[in-house]
């Protein structure tokens, strides 16, 4: 089986500034030390054709940062991602302009993907039909609900038939009938040996469709492997975490975050 995505020692840092003065110092003074937050810290993993990888972890762990880097909308500070094929990212409102109508967004997004107008014209009816938006396709996206935006984004991205699909919580909004329709499409992609990264807090969906799990905790890759090996460990952790009081949960998160801040 061929490697479709190779994530090599990926780190994503953000400089933290309390004042504009600190920001100016950092810009003007070489090697000026400042507080830095590690959103991701030395992540490495390989995904193969046909892998459906669930990215799991509590809120703030770095899942969405990693999915954006895999998708190419965010660059790592250190490390690299090698992709063997075209990538599409599905997240709520990802790549959509609120000022444009739904049908204008279809054309705009597909032009950005490199499609010709003739190809876009041929695919647009399929996108509209899958989205189930009806006459709302002619309305500005800023008037859409989060579920409607997710429908449009998902419909565009699955119609262009990518080799690698990144889905970030896009199925967590909207009606369950459409969500199941999307999951059926994901299963089709899985059968076609496409590579899928699936970010979700719905462990039922993760268990149903994923073949592997990447558990992200505090910006680090805590575990990565086959679904049956990793998911039970994450579920046990999550059950223990949910039993904690709000104060204990906050303390746990704070300890994780403390390790992610450094002066450099």
Swiss-Prot record:
It is an enzyme of class 7 (translocase). It comes from Staphylococcus aureus (strain NCTC 8325 / PS 47). GO terms for molecular function: ABC-type teichoic acid transporter activity; ATP binding; ATP hydrolysis activity. InterPro entries: AAA+_ATPase, ABC_transporter-like_ATP-bd, ABC_transporter-like_CS, ABC_transpr_TagH-like, Bact_Polysacc_Export_ATP-bd, P-loop_NTPase. CDD domains: ABC_KpsT_Wzt (cd03220). Part of the ABC transporter complex TagGH involved in teichoic acids export. Responsible for energy coupling to the transport system. It comes from the Bacteria. The gene is tagH. This is Teichoic acids export ATP-binding protein TagH. It holds the Pfam family ABC_tran. Transmembrane segments: none annotated. It catalyses: ATP + H2O + teichoic acidSide 1 = ADP + phosphate + teichoic acidSide 2. The keyword Transport applies.
